[in-house]
Curated annotation (Swiss-Prot):
InterPro entries: GlcNAc_MurG, Glyco_trans_28_C, GlycoTrans_28_N. Its EC number is 2.4.1.227. It holds the Pfam family Glyco_transf_28. Pathway: Cell wall biogenesis; peptidoglycan biosynthesis. HAMAP family: MurG. This is UDP-N-acetylglucosamine--N-acetylmuramyl-(pentapeptide) pyrophosphoryl-undecaprenol N-acetylglucosamine transferase.
Length: 361
């Protein structure tokens, strides 16, 4: 019996790779041959390399898709076209049963190529509104899974909620040596804040913490900065560029998390029922998806939001105090949410859909 094969694609930011990294080991365990199409200079290649999964990576040309006129669009049209040809060549050689796309500009050529070869295309969209790459992908998709409910007019969409690996039980960090060291510098009488900005949104948080000395007079502060030059452990302050195993222990240590509005992160916080404040990237730095996500979470009673323009100590302190005073209300809303799906649940759903759409292939 021929080995089943799947190609993953998606990249440009960590958010366009995370779900793929949750699904890949499950496919490998079930005996699938796994391939990945991306940009060898992109975060997707770096993440696949670090994962040490048995994945065959194929690099293609990719162009940025813009909503505005630019002469660069002309060159990028050719890059996308070349990427489609490269993807066609890869798929003819690999002959996969299915393509799974998590979005990002690099995903467009493989999605188009798979559709041309009549390979079922499954796409995942994390945000309330589709990004440009996924708006294009939707036209070629067999099924698009969505975190948020979509309009009935989008007949190919299937609402699945958020897919997160977070264990909803609180883990103990009491035996963690690094956490013990950090606690020695923290004031046990103060609440602890955790700032996480994601791959694109940390700079404003980093600058705010550096420019706001009163922050560490009133709170213990953890700053996941993405910038190694800021690494520091001092009185009431721990700054680290990147964490893996330490992510959950640091999360457990925090009383309130201040985050950007990327859907992956905020749904992780929802799964943990963690008090959080969303400072979304504005339209000048994004397409406005984080503003929509933040408004949705605030409306549902999961979190409060604070605009970047109002990110100062007085405003932040006021929102933190309000969250803590109403902690039970927010946590009850989060724990009663039905918007979380485990990776195993989604994997089983995806397998069922693949089997249904791939019959005879």
């Amino acid at each position: 019996m021929a080995k089943k094969k799947i190609i993953f694609t998606g990249g440009g930011t960590v958010g366009h790779v995370t779900l793929n990294l949750l699904l890949i080991p499950r496919f490998l365990k079930d005996g699938w041959e796994v391939h990945y199409i991306g940009d060898k200079h992109g975060i997707e290649h770096e993440q696949i390399e670090q994962s040490d999964f048995d994945v065959i990576f194929h690099s293609i040309a990719t162009g940025k898709l813009r909503r505005y006129f630019s002469l660069k669009n002309v060159l990028d049209v050719f890059k996308v076209g070349w990427g489609v040809l490269q993807s066609l060549t890869i798929m003819v050689k690999v002959r996969p049963q299915v393509l799974f796309s998590k979005g990002g500009f690099v995903s467009v050529p493989p999605v188009v190529a798979a559709n041309l070869l009549r390979i079922p295309v499954f796409v995942h969209e994390s945000d309330l509104s589709m990004g440009l790459a996924n708006r294009i992908a939707y036209k070629f998709a067999t099924t698009m899974y969505t975190t948020f409910e979509q309009s009935d007019n989008l007949t190919k969409t299937k609402h699945v909620g958020a897919i997160t690996k977070v264990n909803q039980t609180i883990s103990s960090s009491d035996d963690n040596t690094e956490i013990k060291t950090i606690k020695e510098y923290f004031d046990p009488r103060l609440k602890t804040l955790l700032f996480i900005g994601g791959s694109a949104g940390a700079k404003v948080f980093n600058q705010f913490i550096s420019d706001t000395p009163e922050l560490t007079k009133h709170y213990n502060v953890i700053n996941i900065s993405g910038d190694k030059t800021l690494n520091n452990l001092s009185q009431n302050l721990y700054r680290v560029d990147y964490v893996t195993e330490m992510y959950q222990p640091l999360m457990d240590l925090a009383d309130v998390v201040i985050t950007r509005g990327g859907s992956n992160t905020i749904f992780e916080l929802l799964a943990m029922a963690k008090l959080h404040i969303i400072v979304p990237l504005g339209k000048e730095a994004s397409r406005g998806d984080q503003l929509e996500n933040a408004a949705y979470f605030e409306e549902k009673g999961y979190a409060q939001q604070l605009s970047e323009e109002n990110l100062n100590f007085a405003e932040l302190d006021k929102v933190i105090k309000d969250l803590l005073e109403n902690q039970t209300v927010y946590q009850d809303k989060m724990t009663s949410s039905s918007e979380i799906k485990t990776p195993n649940d989604f994997y089983n759903l995806l397998l069922t859909d693949i089997t249904s759409k791939s019959k005879g292939k």
